[in-house]
Amino acid sequence: MKGKQGMCFLSLCLAVLLLACEGAEPALDASMARSNGESEEVTVDSLAIKAKQAILAYPALTDANCEEFLLTWAAEHPEHRFELTTSKGDMLLETFDDVPLHSANFHYKVARKYYAPSEFVRIVPDFVVQGGNSEDTRAQELRWLIGKHTLPAEFHSNRLHFRGALAMGRTYTGNPEKRSASYDFYLVVGRKVTRAELARLEREKGFTYTEAQKARYVREGGTPHLDFEHTVFGQLTDGFDALKALSIEPTDASDWPLRRQEFRLKVLSD
């Protein structure tokens, strides 16, 4: 075991050196993703140059330093609109000011080109389309360089899992504070919800939905059982047909798409 760990550590060090020198209802667990064996080819020289520039410019994020860094980033980068390009069409997203850490984290990862490209790793019809936690070589290297960290939960009574909600995945095991993953996001496809279901959830969660929120869940649908379990930090504003088309892509038994569903994200000027 020690030999294998040593080899893994050595391989990771060599990779970094190369980069530096050459440039129930279902739950959402960020630890569920696994590789489908289709790793993207890495262009070493261009990636190395960008990675080297990134290393020199920014610290590796940790649970200890991410909050201060992201709040500073948010103050310097006020944009809240994003374009999500997929095989089914383009979507427009917006993030919320009152969820500052998650919104800044998303902006930062987009600006660092982490999602250019990435892939959707979990698709469940009438539930969610989840992406970002790719196990491609490029994604793993960038997560190591940018920093492996989590985010404190930012729950708000007005930020719920309606259809089109943008939220972060998280690990369920050993995570009583419900801290979010920092790369793994999802979009709610959802299904129609009855008032009886909402009443049951109110009893279970000790939360009362407003009449407007109940009406919206009944009218539009969503995944209300995830309310106050995952942080909602944005929403889809255009491209619902593309989201629906993605949500019915064939998958294997673990909800991984049978065909690679690549996407790209970019920041739009407000």
Residue spans for each PLM region:
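Cyclophilin-like peptidyl-prolyl cis-trans isomerases
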Residues: C21-D270
